Amino acid sequence: ATYKVKLVTPDGPVEFNCPDDVYILDQAEEEGHELPYSCRAGSCSSCAGKVSAGTVDQSDGNFLDDDQIADGFVLTCVAYPQSDVTIETHKEEDLTG
């Protein structure tokens, strides 16, 4: 399946379609959108965003704890869309406090 991903960035919102077997960060880059990242392996917080609508599968990541995931935080480098989804990007500071 392919879902519509909306990223709310500091420069404004962008939308693109993302297959459910492609990481959101990878697809965003394919579409020409620059997002923050570092490890690309789900083990840091550089790419952190916050899901405001929809659901993702980020089971490949290991940096976020259950409370952070429950609060809606997402690592875009290891997140597959499971529905149409809206994510606020550039949330590393909110995550790390």
From Swiss-Prot:
PANTHER family: FERREDOXIN (PTHR43112), FERREDOXIN-2, CHLOROPLASTIC (PTHR43112:SF3). One of its GO terms (cellular component) is chloroplast stroma. NCBIfam families: fdx_plant. One of its GO terms (biological process) is electron transport chain. Residues 3-93 form the 2Fe-2S ferredoxin-type domain. Signal peptide: none annotated. It holds the Pfam family Fer2. The lineage of its organism: Eukaryota, Viridiplantae, Streptophyta, Embryophyta, Tracheophyta. This is Ferredoxin-1. Its main location: plastid. InterPro entries: 2Fe-2S_ferredoxin-like_sf (IPR036010), 2Fe-2S_ferredoxin-type (IPR001041), 2Fe2S_fd_BS (IPR006058), Beta-grasp_dom_sf (IPR012675), Fd_pln (IPR010241). It comes from the Eukaryota. Belongs to the 2Fe2S plant-type ferredoxin family. It is found in: Plastid, Chloroplast.
